[in-house]
Amino acid sequence: LTKSVIYAIFLIDFSPARGVFLIQKNKSSSLQADSTVVPGAERRIPLLHGTDDPFSCVSESLQLVEENLVRAVRSRELDLTRIASHLIDSGGKRVRPMVTLLAYFAFGGQRTQDIVDIATAIELIHTATLLHDDIIDGAETRRGKESAFKKFGLKSTLVTGDFLFIKAFEFAGKFDETVVQWTADACTLLTEGEILQGHFNRNRAVTVEDYLEIVKRKTASLFHTGAKVGAYLAGAHSSLVDEAESYGLNMGIAFQMVDDILDVVGHIDLLGKPIGMDLRDGNPALPIILSVIDGDPATIGAFENGKPTEAQINAALDSIKTGSSIQEAKSLSKRYAREALKAVKKLPPSMYRNGLKSLVQLIIDRDF
């Protein structure tokens, strides 16, 4: 895949740190990481120049994940298969399993089927949360198609989400207690993040610190769990498992920040959903929070209104675009991206490490 094609794919299909960074504008958008390696981290890992994009690095393993997903959703109750397949077949770039696979191979992992199975579990959990999120939000579309909730109804979609959680642990349950516990912990964080987000729905008192806590749990949990499990199963030293976790955590936060920005400045044809959905739903997204903190009346009015009109939403979006919130949000997303890259530099050189670096860059470089 060429770089431009990869960017286009991310634009079409992307819809989910330790401490709080200060928001500041960066003089350069370049994200760099040097090639320093922690002593003792060197393993026999193949170097393959010219294939640094994350897709080609793990394309064969991702195909195995796809095959697992198809098998996983088969059921005697055809409605379960039909509803799950409706979302699984609608696309998505499988970023969470990609992180898991890249981390595993970057640390010298050799047992492909093992990591494919846990990557499948993580994607099944993510898919389950999407089904449940669409119910919570009353979403009519998902990935450019009618949402499962809209097409099949609340009850069947809810049960299908539960079904996918169960299937996820059929895969995760094959591993040792540590992996199972980390996977369960990720599910706990997801649910906590959803509840915490609800506390700040249409609440102008929400802060950036509150937002980060939501994102760490709701979005970043599967990213950092996938990276951590990948490193652990590859046999990495505990200090390097921590670095992998830091990579996933910071990348997941940056990912959500960019997603929030695109909800304001993106295009429906590329996003597969209307822009301004966070304002419509009252979600505490980063550009909205920053605009509310700045005291913008249009944003405050639309955010606090239980049923904002399209005119109110459009006025708020225009105000956010012309204010400083988008630039501040971009700056903060790049700050977290750089933290992810700091963790990557501790890995031994390989195409997989390069893939992890490129994945961060692709997320940050999505066109605004």
Regions of interest found by a model, annotated:
Residues 2-368:
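All-alpha prenyltransferase/terpene-synthase fold signal
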